[in-house]
Amino acid sequence: MSTETDWVYRVDEPHGSEGWRPYGDQPERWRGTVTSDDPKEDAEYVAALVVTDLVSEWYRQGAAQRHVRVIVWQDAEGTGPEDAAFMVEIQPHIDGE
């Protein structure tokens, strides 16, 4: 019996009245699958890995924090946060701090 779980993630950015779209100039960079056999490495864990990678890239590029959301599904990509196992939204500081 396999205990592996596939966690599929996607990073989206707001796109005005059209809603959300895949993040960045290379959206495939921010879409993928993490396979884990450790029950502690759940959807929230995968989202934390992706957020850490995003923030590291922003620092490397000297870019400001951006408004994005990280969506994680179990086994297969869904349509949005409504069918996700976990979703976190990052919003930039609007007060400049």
Question: Predicted segments — roles?
Answer:
Residues 21-41:
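A short, exposed loop/beta-hairpin motif centered on an aromatic-Gly-Thr core
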Residues 2-28:
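Short aromatic-glycine-(Arg/Gly/Cys) micro-motifs in beta-strand/loop hairpins
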Residues 38, 43, 63-67:
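Mixed-charge, low-complexity intrinsically disordered regions enriched for alternating acidic
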Residues 42-54:
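Short amphipathic, charge-patterned alpha-helical segments
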Residues 52-97:
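Short, mixed-charge low-complexity intrinsically disordered segments
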